[in-house]
Regions:
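Positively charged n-region of N-terminal signal peptides that target proteins for export
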Residues: 1-3
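Hydrophobic h-region of N-terminal signal peptides that target proteins for export
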Residues: 6-15
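A short alpha-helix/helix-coil micro-patch that ends at or immediately precedes a cysteine
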Residues: 15-65
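Short, polar/charged, Gly/Pro-enriched helix-capping and turn/loop motifs at alpha-helix termini
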Residues: 35-36, 70, 118
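Disulfide-stabilized extracellular recognition modules
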Residues: 90, 94, 98-153
C-alpha cells in the first residue's frame, strides 16, 4: 500500500489575511513578466475558490496514488470535467501540474519559469484559483501539485 498524504493549501480564515500561496501568486501577477519571450502585463489579483480547491485536491490525490503526472485523470477526466463535478461553472479554465518541489513557493517559482505555466499564472482571463498538493513517499516524483484557474460566467 502506498503512503499517501494529502494537503490542500486552504486560505486562512476570513478576516485573518489571505493564504500565503494566493498572496505569493498575486505578487507575481502584480508585476509584468516575460514568459518564454512573450511579455505579459500585470494582471488583476485572483480570489481563492473552494470548488477549484476540491477539483485540484482530487487530481493531486489521483496522480499521487497512481504515480503519474498529467492533465488527464486515471478515470479519463479532464480539468473541465473535474471542476464541473465540483459544481464550478466557468467561462475560462486552466490548469498547471507539477511534481517535485516540497514547498508551494518553489512550485510557483517553477511554474513562473516555464513559458506555458507562466502564461496561465499571468493570464488576465482568470479571476479565481486554487492550489493543492499530495505526497506519495514511494513515488520517484514525491510531491504532486495542481493549480486550477477559472472565471465564472
Amino acid at each position: 500500500m502506498r503512503l499517501l498524504l494529502l494537503l490542500a493549501l486552504l486560505p486562512a480564515c476570513a478576516g485573518q489575511g489571505a493564504d500565503p500561496v494566493l498572496e505569493a501568486l498575486n505578487r507575481i501577477r502584480a508585476e509584468g513578466r516575460t514568459c518564454g519571450g512573450v511579455y505579459h502585463p500585470a494582471a488583476p489579483p485572483l480570489a481563492w475558490d473552494a470548488r477549484l480547491t476540491a477539483a485540484a485536491r482530487a487530481h493531486t490525490e489521483d496522480m499521487a496514488a497512481h504515480g503519474f503526472l498529467g492533465h488527464v485523470g486515471t478515470d479519463g477526466s479532464t480539468v473541465r470535467e473535474r471542476v464541473e463535478r465540483e459544481g464550478y461553472l466557468w467561462s475560462a479554465l486552466g490548469e498547471n501540474v507539477a511534481y517535485g518541489p516540497a514547498q508551494a513557493e518553489a512550485a510557483l517559482r517553477a511554474w513562473a519559469e516555464s513559458p506555458g505555466h507562466c502564461a496561465n499564472l499571468m493570464s488576465g482571463g482568470y479571476s479565481e484559483m486554487a492550489v493543492a498538493h499530495a505526497v506519495n513517499a514511494r513515488s520517484d516524483m514525491g510531491v504532486y501539485w495542481v493549480q486550477q484557474f477559472g472565471t465564472p460566467p
